[in-house]
Amino acid sequence: MSNIDLIGMSNRDLIGMSNSELLTVEPLDLQFPFELKKQISCSLYLTNKTDNNVAFKVKTTNPKKYCVRPNTGVVLPRSTCEVLVTMQAQKEAPSDMQCKDKFLLQGVIASPGVTAKEVTPEMFSKEAGHRVEETKLRVTYVAPPRPPSPVHEGSEEGSSPRASVSDNGHGSEFSFERFIVDNKAGHQENTSEARALITKLTEEKQSAIQLNNRLQRELDQLRRESKKSQSGGIPFMYVLLVGLIGLILGYIMKRT
């Protein structure tokens, strides 16, 4: 069967040919998660429904675009064979994301003991009188899988890394808003504590200044009274009072 014959097949032909007697093919649609400049692979599974060896051959309308491994082979009785179809990296994406490429799987009963190396094109020749079973496969493009969401390091062990989703689908937004509110509340609490500490220190400093001023006034008054009452040396009580005032001032200044 030529490439022109493959293109001319309709969906009705596909439905009729999918009811195979020799090989069951899964899937009938080759789905490629299309990405530019990246090779993409898709697996075909061929299951032999008979008690005979079945030789197969895979053909495509666009052989330069796809690599099929193996493209020929033998499926043993009541067994399954995997065929890997790889689409070469594409430089441009189709405008409508539609693919017109098609594949054709041919199957024929083979002699007992035949190997994959012994499969020849003549085995699939209808002109030679061989009964060839054919299954047409379509190619479709699908969206590539999304990358997984990153897991936050701060999540607790055993808990889900994703935020719980409510009925309206906005659970992650609510969790994010709650996170912002909690951070603001903690920041405001820390700010309030800092303000209270600053206020307390300011009040203590003002009290120390007032006490210092009062002691200074009392010291000046004692000096004046001392000058009036005594003309000689410095009285012992005066020296004691000055020393006491110095100790008090030193203690206060150390606290502030």
From Swiss-Prot:
Keyword Acetylation carried by entry: yes
Any one of the GO CC terms: endoplasmic reticulum membrane
Residues with N-acetylmethionine modification: 1
Positions of transmembrane segments: 233-253
Sorted UniProt keywords: Acetylation, Coiled coil, Endoplasmic reticulum, Host-virus interaction, Membrane, Phosphoprotein, Transmembrane, Transmembrane helix, Vacuole
GO BP annotations listed: intracellular transport
Cytoplasmic face of the membrane: 1-232
Pfam families: Motile_Sperm
Subcellular location(s) of the protein: Endoplasmic reticulum membrane; Protein storage vacuole membrane
Keyword set includes Isomerase: no
Biased composition (Polar residues): 157-169
Domain MSP: 22-142
Family: Belongs to the VAMP-associated protein (VAP) (TC 9.B.17) family.
Assembly: Homodimer or homooligomer. Interacts with the cowpea mosaic virus (CPMV) NTP-binding protein (NTB). Interacts with NET3C.
UniProt-recorded name of the protein: Vesicle-associated protein 1-1
Organism: Arabidopsis thaliana
